[in-house]
Regions:
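Base-recognition residues in the alpha-helical recognition helix of bacterial helix-turn-helix
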Residues: 46, 72-76, 91
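N-terminal leader segment of winged-helix/HTH proteins
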Residues: 1-36, 109
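N-terminal helix-turn-helix DNA-binding core of bacterial DNA-binding proteins
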Residues: 27-67, 93-100
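Amphipathic alpha-helical interaction surfaces in cytosolic regulatory modules
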Residues: 38, 73-75, 80-81
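Beta-hairpin "wing" of winged helix-turn-helix
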Residues: 79-89, 96
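Short hydrophobic/aromatic patches at helix-to-coil boundaries
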Residues: 110-114
Length: 114
């Protein structure tokens, strides 16, 4: 049986075109995942999700047995990711889950926390 060479229809190494995905979309999702990819931050978010009122940073330090600078570091990451808001009351800072989270983020959190 003779071996026949098949004609090349596509360029070598290119099977099909990828669907268009905006780089900014991927960067935003990756930043969100980075913020969520820590057990302490997930615990903080779960506490804020279940709370009826803002929570003082001092309550997190006592409840999680971590130092205030460590909790502040985690809160900064969550704030940068757009997940929490804060307000200063005297010498303490109180945190709450951001009211206007994107629907997709809220759904993701509800699945992670519920």
């Amino acid at each position: 049986m003779a071996v026949k060479e098949l004609p090349m229809i596509r360029e070598r190494g290119v099977c099909c075109a990828l669907p268009v995905v905006q780089e900014s979309w991927a960067i935003d999702r990756a930043e969100l995942m980075k913020a969520l990819a820590d057990p302490t931050r997930l615990t903080i978010l779960a506490s804020l999700w279940k709370a009826n009122a803002p929570i003082c940073i001092c309550d997190f330090t006592a409840g999680l047995e971590l130092t205030q600078p460590t909790i502040s570091h985690h809160m900064a990451k969550l704030k940068e990711a757009g997940l929490v808001d804060s307000e200063k009351r005297g010498i303490w800072i109180y945190y709450r889950l951001r009211d206007k989270l994107p629907t997709a983020t809220r759904k993701l959190l509800s699945q992670l926390i519920a």
